Amino acid sequence: MKRVLTALAAALPFAAHAADAISGAVERQPTNWQAIIMFLIFVVFTLGITYWASKRVRSRSDYYTAGGNITGFQNGLAIAGDYMSAASFLGISALVFTSGYDGLIYSLGFLVGWPIILFLIAERLRNLGRYTFADVASYRLKQGPIRILSACGSLVVVALYLIAQMVGAGKLIELLFGLNYHIAVVLVGVLMMMYVLFGGMLATTWVQIIKAVLLLFGASFMAFMVMKHVGFSFNNLFTEAMAVHPKGTAIMSPGGLVQDPISALSLGLGLMFGTAGLPHILMRFFTVSDAREARKSVFYATGFMGYFYILTFIIGFGAIMLVGTNPAYKDAAGALIGGNNMAAVHLANAVGGNLFLGFISAVAFATILAVVAGLTLAGASAVSHDLYANVFRKGATEREELKVSKITVLVLGVIAIILGVLFENQNIAFMVGLAFAIAASCNFPIILLSMYWSKLTTRGAMLGGWLGLLTAVVLMILGPTIWVQILGHEKAIFPYEYPALFSISVAFLGIWFFSATDNSAEGNREREQFRAQFIRSQTGFGVEQGRAH
């Protein structure tokens, strides 16, 4: 039975809408025993790490942040492992395979947000926060309302992203391994819960590090073999690709993915600012000892990811030459077996045989586990730390907070499995787009302005943040993806696919207006406290003990 491959949408924001090249019908593949054996080795090894980590998780700090003992280099690898996905690996390679140069431009969208994190967020975030970004947002503002807003923003992003990951995981594993979709979803959910439940951030970090190393190694080997084929000449690579590609020289020209400039700008803003508002990414900056290590983390992560996306560009052009011209990888109709998303997987077979194909397939599964583990921990910390310990039950003991966190992990895992099964045949591409839009429109403005704008008040942050979140949701529903493609209406009320340009503007304007017009005594007190916060954010004085939030 043919199915639509939605795996790409699981971790490649907006990509399912960007081009026909990255969607299409695929058939379930035969059982890939090499991949299954290699994946089982990975699972056994990472479960061993989880057992090791569980013996070292003795406190709330150990569980949420690995005790702050992760080095900048290790955290950079872990961030890269959390952010680089199997779907971006397969999806961007597929974009290059079908559209050429546009694939490289698209991959840059994933990197442009990181300089913002490096120069504007990482250092101050680490100096002001302890476990979640809500610690920073509520540093001088009212704890209750701000934590509720931050937790809601985090949970909505985590839920949307997690559902998309689970559905994408099931489709991808069915495609690569030949396993039943439901078995794949349950397997991912159970392993995800085990990593986070027993090993916390320490186990999650090492799963992400191992996954990043494996993915970088696999992609490097593929790129090396492609370049070896063309005599390590980029000129030969592009010339040969243009000679055999149906579009010819057009694959070296940009502009084929997003024609409308408004949509292009909105897409770019969503990718850029959404990255800086993802709770599972921001949480990683609390795992290092100080602001210096936080900056190092972003520096290393950006380097690893930049290198990775360059490799996907080479892999995509290699697939044009070695896969697109080989009838063994095509069906009777002349289409790529498994769809265009299988271009990189077929290339793995072309350059390394069945054994390397099994390795790449296992790495693809490992990447999914690394991402969902990070998402689950971020969601659990939002519930246990932000809501339970600081809003609903102030003064809760560490033991009580950790108990709530672990219960939340189980609940999130079960819900993710159930929704993953229920959404099997649904279009979930919009979920990731909406997750990034909310991260960019709610989380990012509050984090940025709470650290940099002295006139921010609780009233402005609350009203502007909720306006940004709701605007992103409403415009996404009224846009072409949901209103037309899913709900079946003839014409979209909101004409653009990507709401970020408008929802981010609403959020910033709302925060500015309602803060500027806030003349309350509480608002004035919050403005006066900015100086103390600024000194702490710059110097890190007192960060070792942490502020009682």
Curated annotation (Swiss-Prot):
Gene3D superfamilies: Sodium/glucose cotransporter (1.20.1730.10). Keywords: Cell inner membrane, Cell membrane, Ion transport, Membrane, Sodium, Sodium transport, Symport, Transmembrane, Transmembrane helix, Transport. It is found in: Cell inner membrane. GO terms for molecular function: acetate transmembrane transporter activity; glycolate transmembrane transporter activity; symporter activity. The keyword Transmembrane applies. It comes from the Bacteria. Belongs to the sodium:solute symporter (SSF) (TC 2.A.21) family. Transports acetate. This is Cation/acetate symporter ActP. The lineage of its organism: Bacteria, Pseudomonadati, Pseudomonadota, Gammaproteobacteria, Enterobacterales.
